Amino acid sequence: MSSQVFVNPEEIDVFINEIRGFLDSLNSSTNRLNHAFETLSSSWQDRKRAEFEEEYRELLRVLKIFENNSEEKIQYLSMLSQKAKDYLSS
């Protein structure tokens, strides 16, 4: 039994650009939110703030994992796209 894979390199490239844009936007938004939260920390100091900070730090940890995994997938997809382009141009 042979298996076949159908790949559209243009669609892969579009997706790569979309995920890169998403990651850039996510990082920018995260940096702004970090700054705002640090500024607020001087005036919001109760149990709810501590709970929020714990949840927020966990979210940042998960987002960092997603970012790292996405970077790995981008590398793979870039290689796959290039192989498909090479194959299609031969």
Each model region followed by its residue ranges:
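N-terminal secretion-targeting helices of virulence/extracellular proteins
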Residues: M1-S90
